[in-house]
A protein has these predicted regions:
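Adenine nucleotide-associated cytosolic modules
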Residues: 1-179
Length: 179
């Protein structure tokens, strides 16, 4: 309601459901860009596989304690999440935000950068973070940019989109391709 008051031309769709393999394709189909703030690896891989299949860019943001990261995964123009993280780390190395703690302002910093990257994609402005990772370290108040290249062993690509089976993922988050 607040957004409609600010700009009546903006349509907001809400989904009161958990994103899973049974609904993800219907929910994300037709969007120009997806903003990802998922806090777990199975959801990130599920979103990656669906967005790769549909050719939709994803503005990814993640946080951990005092650090954050933002990247744009564009299946038609650059690397994807599976290129950056082919396999999830062991559970003991990836505690939840509740277990590890997160600096309270960090989601706002990362979210603001994601909003900027989303606008850059939608308006075709500037140089987006496709093929790059922006790392934020709030303990040093430093920002670093790293290059990200496609992993030649990654089989979840837009070229293979007809073989990608979007499924709920187990703890291994292994890709599902039909033969």
């Amino acid at each position: 309601q607040t957004i409609a008051k600010l700009n009546p031309d903006v349509k907001v769709n809400t989904y009161d459901t958990r994103l899973d393999a049974s609904n993800i394709m219907d929910i994300i189909a037709g969007y120009d860009v997806i903003v990802d703030g998922a806090d777990n690896f199975p959801s990130r891989y599920l979103l990656n596989d669906a967005s790769v299949k549909l050719g939709i860019p994803v503005v990814h943001g993640s946080i951990f304690r005092f650090e954050g990261m933002v990247s744009v995964f564009h299946p038609l123009r650059g690397p994807t999440y599976r290129d950056m993280v082919p396999e999830p780390p062991p559970a003991e190395l990836a505690p939840s935000c509740a277990e590890a703690g997160v600096l309270g302002v960090l989601p706002g910093i990362v979210g603001s950068i994601q909003a900027l990257e989303t606008l850059k994609i939608l308006l075709d402005l500037g140089d987006s973070l496709i093929g790059r990772i922006l790392s934020v370290d709030t303990t040093e108040m430093s920002f670093r940019v790293f290059k990200l290249r496609a992993d030649p062993s990654n089989v979840v690509t837009h070229e293979n989109r007809d073989r990608i089976e979007v499924r709920d993922l187990d703890g291994l988050c292994a890709p599902w391709l039909s033969h």
